[in-house]
């Protein structure tokens, strides 16, 4: 019997492929499965390609650059070509790290680069060029875990804690669902303080959060973590 054709890789969009890979991982699909393996091969083939951030990370597709990029939880991330390339590049590092994919890309060089760049840009190791890009890099570092990643994340959490909470109960400036999703994956005790700060806001939207599409499923996952006691 022929194996079912992959529904994970989308050669027109790195973003869609990465989000589908994450859902496959959460469903427990094996890395050795044909669909997952094909998608991982395609992602690794794009490292250092045309349009890659700093010529090093995973290159977005033409569709990714033309469309309004959204992170997996749906918040707008259309920050121009450089911003899209950066966020998707970080998300690709995260995906390959979580799938424990070593071959096909210069893992040590790439991970060392994102760690060291985080340490030197903007004067704070936990902040990158903007808040959305910062969260993307937190996710990549949490998955890849290079030396010193905990210190970088702790600084990021400190910066998050310095943000005031708006009238809706959310952090000012940070993408709410995307940040929650990042914190839910961060194995540091400091995340609990931030979870408590926004728990009431998460509880208000959880009961009406639908799971009709991939964005809804990622949002619900983040909200369920935020409201857990």
What are these regions (language model features)?
Residues 1-229:
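Preference for long, amphipathic alpha-helical scaffolds in soluble/luminal domains
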